[in-house]
Amino acid sequence: YQRFQKDRRRTAKAAAVWLDALEAYRLRLRQLKVLDPACGSGAFLIQALELLKREQRWVAEEVLRITGQAEVWDMDDVVNDILASNLYGVDINAESLEIAKLALWMHTATPGRPLSRLDDNLRCGNSLVGPDFYQQHQRELFSKAEQERINVFDWQAAFPAVIAQGGFDCIVSNPPYVKLQNFRRVFGSA
């Protein structure tokens, strides 16, 4: 009997440690900042959303397995939290960005619930060219059309809270498939 009680206390202690670890992991998941700096139609953001949903679901299942008590949580709320707090995208093409928003909405829409607001986390701009570009190159050398096409992106202005917390935790993206000649035409042969 004493051995049984000792094993039972050891098991309870291990369960408490595991529950603490799960809660720490859940908190870290909620704080994770994922960026696609050339998000296009949002394919990588959708995959990141699915991964974060799976991880949140796994944590809830582990808590249920250990405690025998199901947590009260709503996957729609989890999805809205992920969209609001975890996923960020930038694209130089405004139309592609709208397609990314539409793809995320189509992927997460639930009847009877409003669509998530994505404008704060999905931004239009050239993620490779920052606001100091015109300090290095005289603005008047570029026509208005060229300036619009260059579309400098100010990370600090677009995502101040993320930058203040140290930046993004994870960057997901395809490599830029751009001809070098296009860069030379816009930026010169530096």
Please give the residue ranges for each predicted region:
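SAM-dependent methyltransferase catalytic region
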Residues: 1-190
